[in-house]
Amino acid sequence: MLSWAITFLIIAIIAAVLGFGGIAGAATGIAKILFVLFLVLFVVSFFFGRRRG
């Protein structure tokens, strides 16, 4: 599960960079939402992954 969270976090960061860079100006809001969503998923899966060993 942690690997999925890291994968989606990287995708969200790439989308944010492209959105903030002016390449896809309309996608900026989506990139912000995805970044926050996958950052939260990353943190949650990181802590639950540590508990399971």
UniProtKB/Swiss-Prot annotation:
Cysteine disulfide partners in this protein: none
Any one GO cellular component localisation term in the record: plasma membrane
Positions of transmembrane segments: 4-24, 29-49
Zinc-finger listed as a keyword: no
Compartments reported by the entry: Cell membrane
Topology in membrane: Multi-pass membrane protein
Stated name of the protein: UPF0391 membrane protein PA5482
Keyword tags: Cell membrane, Membrane, Transmembrane, Transmembrane helix
UniProt keyword Transmembrane present: yes
Pfam family, one: DUF1328
Family: Belongs to the UPF0391 family.
HAMAP family: UPF0391
Coiled coil ranges: none
InterPro entries: DUF1328
